[in-house]
Amino acid sequence: PLSSIISFFQNHKLFNFTNRPQWKTVKGGSKNYIKKLIQASHFDIKKSFKIDKIIRDQGVEILSQNKKYQFDLLVLACPPHHFLPLLGDKKEKEASILNAFNFQKNLAQLHQNSSLMPPHKAAWSSWNFHTNTNNKCTLSYWMNLLQPLDTKDEFFVSLNQNQTSNLYQTVYEHPIFSLNTLNSQKEIGKIQGLNDTFYVGSYLGYGFHEDGIQSALKVCKKLNINLGLFNEADTSRIQWN
């Protein structure tokens, strides 16, 4: 929807032709801030933990490999289509809102093929798009500028280009933003806390890391958790009340 695009451009100062903000990136990539969060946490972390079912009746019960784990509250920090099949019968009201969030799988490939970039290097930017006669658009990230990388070799990450020669590839899931999605981003406030369950994730904003963090901060505020320096943190990218 046009309103979403305009709001996105306003929030990211993309309408500014002068005095545009200087973007910053985490040194070493997002894995480093995730590592710091894990190191600073005050809770038990279980990785590669397969969940078979979630029962929410007088608290939360997690079933995993014939074992039961009891909790007071549940915070689901993953896309709805990952957790909805795990929830028990008490999910009709939640599903009516959460089913509006759709995702698309995108093939991401790391390569050195500069032919996908603008012909003139002066026009290269962090994000670049390439179209063909079939009206297919491919997005390419210039990693040397985006990270930045300390090397003379050029590296790019392209989505859905299906390069035959690539250094690495993986598949990501990205949220699809429709009018129903934007409405559900506001409606999800009605089910936050229902059945002792809360929802966080970048799909509640614009799909960026910042949106995932802001959605988590907003849930913490709703639970009256003391966040210290983050008590006054901005959560304006998340629309539910």
List PLM regions with ranges:
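A structural signal for well-ordered alpha-helical segments within the folded catalytic domains
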Residues: 28-35, 81, 214-217
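Active-site/ligand-binding neighborhood in enzyme catalytic cores
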Residues: 1-49, 53, 57
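A structural signal for the hydrophobic beta-strands that form the central parallel beta-sheet
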Residues: 45-47, 76, 199
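Active-site catalytic microenvironments for nucleophilic, acid-base chemistry
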Residues: 40, 44, 89, 222, ...
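Short, well-ordered alpha-helix to beta-strand connector turns
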Residues: 41, 71-72, 195
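Conserved beta-strand termini and adjacent loop/short-helix elements that scaffold enzyme active sites
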Residues: 48-50, 65, 200
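Conserved flavin/dinucleotide-binding core of flavoenzymes
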Residues: 135-241
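Mid-domain catalytic core of redox enzymes
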Residues: 52-177
